[in-house]
Structures are given as C-alpha cells and as structure tokens.
Amino acid sequence: MNYSVMIQNRRSVHAFREKEVPSEAIGQLRSYYEKTCPRLVPEIATELIVLDKDAQPALESSAGYNQFLIGAPHYLLLMSAPHSYAAINAGYMMEDLVLKLTELDIDTCWMTFTDSDKIKKALSLTTPLEVAAIVAFGYGEKTAKKLRLNILSMSQIDVRASSSTTRPKRACMIWFTWGVGATSLGLTR
C-alpha cells in the first residue's frame, strides 16, 4: 500500500449509499488485518468484527455523535484487551484499516462512543475484549460539485470546484510522528 497516496485520497463520508461492499473486498480487509496490519503494541490482543447494516438499530442507542449514528451498509469494530496503550494501538490499527479501505475505493467514517459495555450488550457480544474503535464503511453518496475558496495564505487564494466537502490534507510529514510507528513500517528519515 502506498501510504502517501492513500492519505491524500482518504476522506470521511457522512452519507452512504445502500450498496453493499462485495464479500471479496471484506475478505481482503480481514486478510490484511490478520497478516499485514501493523500494531504499535503487538502483545495487546485484538479482534476485528465486521457488522452489516442489520447491526445499525443496536448501535443507534450506543454509538454515534450524541447518539446520532451514521447509517452505513457495514461497520468495523476493533476490540482490544485492556492495556494502558490500548486506545493508541487501536487508533493506529483502525486508521491503517481505513487506509486499506481507501485503497479498495471504499469510503469510511469514524464513529464516536463512550461506553464499550453498552455496545457489547446491544450487539450481544460475550468477548472479554473491550470495544476500542468503530468505523462505518461503504460507498458514499454522490455529491454535487461545490465551489470552494481555498485560502493557503494571504497571497495564495484560489477557487476550486470540489465534488466533496473534504478539506485539503496537510503534508503527510506534518502529521506523521517519527518513532515507533515509523520504525514498525520500516520508514526512516
């Protein structure tokens, strides 16, 4: 996976079409998680659960922005064993899975939640692992092109036609923290 290209192409979608993601793509995602997905702390036990749209009613009362759940054909739940670095590890892993979905031309949206036990109860999950991250995924609705005023500085202003409401990405180097994450991916300065 070319991380630089995937980071530039990644966007968050808040309206999904009803179109299901093919089982082959979900299989590729599962295989990527099991064999390739980097972990910051490999000794933390994790599990990836892929849910379909039938899980939406259960998630509506326990996840989403102020209990407002983004409707999607599928949801990813990343479960993690309790650990002082569980949240960091899960965020790192899930963002890598989001980039893999981007590579497969599948749109995503991170979901907020505050109570792992409430989600586990709503979904009837009996695992000892805790919910660490949730992402909705599928194919985003087509959006009309909109004019966007792009102000880079006081002297660099342009107007662009944009087909999405995403914001330009800052250079990858600004956001990427050199250290454990870089070395686990085999990157050097």
Regions from the PLM with identified roles:
Residues 1-189:
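Acidic, surface-exposed loops and disordered segments
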